[in-house]
């Protein structure tokens, strides 16, 4: 593949590859080097065409995979495991990776898809082992998540002290996990110097180590965006079925519609409306579909939304106060039994007030080996949005295209709309996050602001914001269609 630069160089510097060529005594540029060597590979095609297409497809002979004996490595790994202590697995997070992007505030604030914690690394441990070592997590009075500290010691004496603990449902007993990539001090802004450096425990190119764990004093304050772990027996809202049932059974069997009572009759909820319907014969109408069968909760869409819509980064302390600004979130829910169907059965068998209270209290806790479900949530652009009816200044309104609009310069920040939103997807600017030295996350200097999308307004303090269904893109589509006479 051949890639071209998208913008000119920002600083008067040499490309890394040009430096390597200079060290090798080559006075040419890396561009000339690539072009010269490409000529020996490209056959039947011109350099300009390959540069235009970005890729050259050639024919190569089949390569046979070599054989190797992995038994020695397996035996060495087995011997490294001790019958005592725990097995530590060092891993890289989906967002931050191995730490090369630790200066990227988007990735620092991105909540882990499983633990839903941002701005931190921590040791994950099973519920059984947490009880054994007297480690715990708790939701405190201000809604924040706190956790115990622990000290990890490897068999060769390497030690990492005061590691925060997350009790992780579904984790294998006898194992703990710790993310690499955190704890860097060099070449980082002060705000990004978070977490602990787990590379001190990485020995012999082996990410699995035998360790001992001891409890340490104190409590750690996490920035967690989701305190609810389970659906508390409401697993029937997860509409899942098999391909066979989907193809052979009526939709009412695998996707029953909710019913409401009207005039002493049970009718489908979609047939009842307090408001007059909109005239859908006028205007363009857009739809955003999310394939929940394909969604793994990776969160790449969350970062894409941040980049496209100039969503500000607020930092760990603000996230802990539930002031994160993500327009799109991916909720993660565990079953309290081994499956969500088991949750439904348990709820159906509840009888009496005392049984109800005790059972639902237990169902708030995730099972030891639960089923997991991910749910992307953004503004649903409701037909008759409850946020629209409570805004005293009509800052949020419904368009002919079916989108729920926000007029930022009309908003006075009452936050009534956020209170009335059933999906809790509205975000309030508690501070001015751009051009503010208190929030040094690349929106307060000229270089950092170069990443902002010029087609999207940067919001100010006291203004509510939310998913716009990328209205700048839908408007661009409409303008293109007009130019083409469609």
Where are these regions (language model features)?
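Iron-sulfur cluster-binding cysteine motifs and their immediate structural context
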Residues: 296, 300-319, 329, 384-410, ...
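Non-catalytic, well-ordered alpha-helical segments in soluble enzyme domains
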Residues: 14-40
């Amino acid at each position: 593949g051949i890639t071209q630069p998208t913008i000119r160089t920002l600083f008067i510097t040499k490309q890394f590859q040009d430096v390597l060529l200079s060290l090798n005594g080559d006075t040419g540029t890396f561009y000339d080097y690539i072009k010269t060597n490409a000529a020996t590979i490209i056959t039947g095609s011109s350099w300009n065409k390959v540069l235009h297409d970005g890729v050259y497809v050639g024919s190569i002979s089949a390569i046979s995979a070599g054989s190797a004996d992995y038994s020695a490595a397996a035996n060495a790994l087995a011997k490294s495991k001790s019958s005592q202590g725990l097995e530590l697995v060092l891993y890289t997070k989906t967002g931050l990776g191995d730490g090369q992007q630790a200066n990227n505030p988007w990735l620092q604030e991105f909540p882990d898809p499983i633990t839903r914690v941002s701005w931190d690394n921590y040791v994950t441990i099973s519920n059984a082992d947490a009880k054994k070592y007297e480690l715990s997590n708790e939701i405190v009075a201000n809604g924040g998540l706190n956790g115990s500290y622990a000290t990890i010691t490897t068999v060769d004496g390497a030690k990492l002290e005061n590691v925060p603990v997350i009790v992780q449902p579904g984790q294998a007993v006898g194992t703990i996990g710790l993310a690499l990539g955190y704890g860097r001090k060099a070449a980082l802004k002060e705000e990004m110097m978070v977490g602990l450096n787990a590379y001190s425990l990485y020995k012999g190119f082996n990410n699995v180590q035998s360790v001992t764990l001891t409890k340490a004093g104190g409590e750690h304050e996490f920035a967690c965006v989701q305190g609810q772990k389970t659906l508390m027996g409401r697993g029937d809202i997860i509409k899942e079925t098999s391909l066979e049932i989907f193809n052979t059974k009526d939709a009412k069997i695998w996707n029953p519609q909710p019913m409401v009572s009207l005039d002493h009759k049970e009718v489908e909820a979609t047939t009842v409306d307090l408001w007059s319907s909109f005239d859908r014969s006028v205007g363009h109408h857009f739809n955003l579909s999310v394939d929940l069968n394909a969604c793994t909760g990776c969160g790449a869409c969350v970062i894409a939304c941040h980049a496209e819509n100039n969503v500000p980064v607020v930092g760990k302390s603000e996230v802990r106060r539930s002031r994160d600004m993500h327009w799109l979130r991916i909720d993660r829910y565990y079953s309290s039994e081994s499956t969500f169907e088991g949750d439904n059965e348990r709820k159906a068998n509840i009888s009496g007030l005392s049984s109800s209270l005790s059972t639902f209290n237990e169902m708030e806790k995730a099972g030891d080996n639960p089923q997991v479900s991910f749910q992307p949530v953004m503004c649903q652009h409701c037909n008759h949005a409850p946020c629209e009816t409570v805004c005293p200044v009509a800052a949020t309104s419904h368009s002919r295209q079916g989108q729920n609009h926000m007029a930022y310069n009309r908003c006075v920040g009452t936050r009534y709309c956020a209170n009335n939103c059933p999906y809790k997807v509205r975000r309030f600017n508690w501070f001015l996050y751009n051009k503010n030295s208190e929030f040094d996350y690349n929106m307060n200097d000229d270089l950092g602001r170069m990443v902002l999308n010029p087609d999207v307004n940067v919001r100010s303090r006291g203004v509510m914001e939310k998913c716009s269904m990328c209205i700048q893109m839908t408007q661009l589509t409409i303008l293109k269609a007009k130019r083409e006479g469609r």
